[in-house]
Curated annotation (Swiss-Prot):
Organism ancestry: Bacteria, Bacillati, Bacillota, Bacilli, Bacillales
NCBIfam families (UniProt xref): purM
Any one cellular-component term (Gene Ontology): cytosol
Organism superkingdom: Bacteria
Keyword Lipoprotein: no
Gene that this sequence comes from: purM
Protein name: Phosphoribosylformylglycinamidine cyclo-ligase
Length: 346
């Protein structure tokens, strides 16, 4: 049977075209340590230049979750790749690791070259922001598994850190200051609830601007996850950081305790940073309690670092010089978990 594979739903020629179109984007992420080119059976990365006493590789993997469904609805695919990279590199930089390279996995119902190119364009942008190379990936056309408009996106990153410089959180003590780095919005967690509250129950339109939003709802919801790698690595060069938390699924309540040693809790001062309007809209339309919001969403803070009190203001200044919006949002205390206290509105 001629073109049997194509008749089964797999278009090999479209796959070749997609690879050809993505190469120019991938090339912009290259580092001098990358060996070989795109299309080999494996990606290679030379570690010999890293003059570390005890080099440790740190890896992280993640996906974008149901935020992808917003990309399908809006037919916008050029930024969702940034989210895939961000979710991985932010997870390893909190341990002090410099991301070295990234590999992606795209599974789709139909390999449309222009759509695949746009996805990889976003992945490449995320890699540039993180300073890591996109050294490989896989695009799997899976008719029958996904509809022709659907795809899933995941990836993983590998980074490196000297063993003595790993940030573990084990030295955090009561009285350390917590600094929050602003998020760009919802990032990549909680989108099943977002869709239910705003689109299904609230019947809001992706094309309209609501409340204090500055963008149409669809654009607001598709804002890419902020990548904190470069400012955090710069911070680690100049100050001691005792612990870091990437505020992802589970919000403040689940993620901040992940960096804290036993017997230490966190006290967060409400009002010490600006909560973006999208969270207020979600809470209002969904009639969600504040505690539930903090247990699901980042609430405007995408990364939290624990530092000594006497260095806190200098660190905020350094982060702001790196282009970050940084705020002192609380401190560590004897105890456990996360508690919230009322503060002064910023």
């Amino acid at each position: 049977m001629a073109n049997a594979y194509k008749q089964a739903g797999v278009d090999i020629e479209a796959g070749y075209e997609a690879v050809s179109r993505m190469k120019k984007h991938v090339q912009t992420t290259m580092r001098k340590e990358v060996l070989g080119g795109l299309g080999g059976f494996g990606g290679m990365f030379d570690l010999s230049k890293f003059a570390l006493e005890e080099p440790v590789l740190v890896s992280g993997t993640d996906g974008v979750g149901t935020k992808l469904m917003l990309a399908f609805m809006a037919d916008k695919h050029d930024t969702i790749g940034i989210d895939a990279v961000a979710m991985c590199v932010n997870d390893i930089v909190v341990q002090g690791a410099e991301p070295l390279f990234f590999l992606d996995y795209i599974a789709c119902g139909k390999a449309e070259p222009s759509k695949i190119e746009n996805i990889v364009k976003g992945i490449s942008e995320g890699c540039r922001q993180a300073g890591c190379a996109l050294i490989g990936g896989e695009t799997a056309e899976m008719p029958g598994m996904y509809s022709t408009e659907e795809y899933d996106l995941a990836g993983f990153t590998v980074g490196i850190v000297d063993k003595k410089k790993i940030v573990t959180g084990e030295k955090i003590e009561a009285g350390h200051v917590l600094i929050g780095l602003a998020s760009s919005g919802i990032h990549s967690n909680g989108y099943s609830l977002v869709r239910k509250v705003l689109l299904e129950d609230g019947e809001l339109s992706l094309d309209r601007i609501y409340g204090r939003l500055e963008l149409p709802l669809g654009e607001e919801l598709l804002k890419p996850t902020k990548i904190y790698v470069k400012p955090i690595l710069e911070l680690l060069k100049k100050h001691e950081v005792y612990g870091m938390a990437h505020i992802t699924g589970g919000g403040f309540i689940e993620n901040i305790p992940r960096m804290l040693p036993e017997g230490i809790g966190a006290e967060i001062e409400l009002g010490s940073w600006q909560v973006q309007p999208i969270f207020s809209l979600l809470q209002e339309v969904g009639k969600l309690e504040e505690k539930e919001m903090f247990n699901i969403f980042n609430m405007g803070i995408g990364m939290v670092v624990a530092v000594k009190e006497e260095e806190a203001k200098d660190i905020v200044r350094l982060l702001e010089e790196q282009g970050e919006k940084a705020h002192i949002i609380g401190h560590t205390v004897q105890g456990s978990g996360v508690t919230f206290i009322e503060g002064t509105e910023v």
